[in-house]
Amino acid sequence: MSGGKYVDSEGHLYTAPIREQGNIYKPNNKAMAEEMNEKQVYDAHTKEIDLVNRDPKHLNDDVVKIDFEDVIAEPEGTHSFDGIWKASFTTFTVTKYWFYRLLSTLFGIPMALIWGIYFAILSFLHIWAVVPCIKSFLIEIQCIGRVYSIYIHTFCDPLFEAVGKLFSNIRINMQKEI
């Protein structure tokens, strides 16, 4: 607003007033300047990520938690040697762990790129195509709704009122005979 002019209640012309505390970019007030410097600014695109809890919204709780016991089980009476069972457990667990790491190393970034593009396109289409189409449809359907309402009130309401009056005088007596 620098250079702007305004008129007070008596009609005097003034330039735009300068705030004593400055603005958010250049605060004149020392306390305000220190407060601005102390605040941490977080950007949604460069925020810190949690490297320990990588599923904070629990998206994969019941889908991907597959352990050895969930896949391989020996019923009572048909057991392999204990050493084979332990080696199978270790092989399964280590293979699953390292093969997942290998796949995520090879395909993690390309898949993140593909899914990022997909959700960007989906968001774009929703914002620029779907919502405007729905709003347009709702505006256009109001006209049809009014015509339909007039039709119902003109033709159907009198018909149903007449049928209702016809059947309103019907009386039913029920007697219980012993």
Curated annotation (Swiss-Prot):
GO cellular component terms given for this protein: caveola; endosome; focal adhesion; Golgi membrane; membrane raft; perinuclear region of cytoplasm; sarcolemma
Sites bearing Phosphoserine, chain numbering: 2, 9
Residue positions of covalent lipid attachment, annotated as S-palmitoyl cysteine: 133, 143, 156
Membrane topology, from the record: Peripheral membrane protein
Entry PTM: Phosphorylated at Tyr-14 by ABL1 in response to oxidative stress. Ubiquitinated. Undergo monoubiquitination and multi- and/or polyubiquitination. Monoubiquitination of N-terminal lysines promotes integration in a ternary complex with UBXN6 and VCP which promotes oligomeric CAV1 targeting to lysosomes for degradation. Ubiquitinated by ZNRF1; leading to degradation and modulation of the TLR4-mediated immune response.
Crosslink feature (Glycyl lysine isopeptide (Lys-Gly) (interchain with G-Cter in ubiquitin)) location: 5, 26, 30, 39, 47, 57
Keyword Repeat attributed: no
Location of region: Interacts with SPRY1, SPRY2, SPRY3 and SPRY4: 131-142, 167-178
Record-listed N-acetylserine modification sites: 2
Keywords: Acetylation, Cell membrane, Golgi apparatus, Isopeptide bond, Lipoprotein, Membrane, Palmitate, Phosphoprotein, Ubl conjugation
Chain intervals for the UniProt region annotation (Interacts with SPRY1, SPRY2, and SPRY4): 149-160
Intramembrane segments: 105-125
GO MF annotations in UniProt: molecular adaptor activity; oxysterol binding; protein kinase binding; transmembrane transporter binding
Function noted in UniProt: May act as a scaffolding protein within caveolar membranes. Forms a stable heterooligomeric complex with CAV2 that targets to lipid rafts and drives caveolae formation. Mediates the recruitment of CAVIN proteins (CAVIN1/2/3/4) to the caveolae. Interacts directly with G-protein alpha subunits and can functionally regulate their activity. Involved in the costimulatory signal essential for T-cell receptor (TCR)-mediated T-cell activation. Its binding to DPP4 induces T-cell proliferation and NF-kappa-B activation in a T-cell receptor/CD3-dependent manner.
Protein name: Caveolin-1
Species the sequence originates in: Dasypus novemcinctus
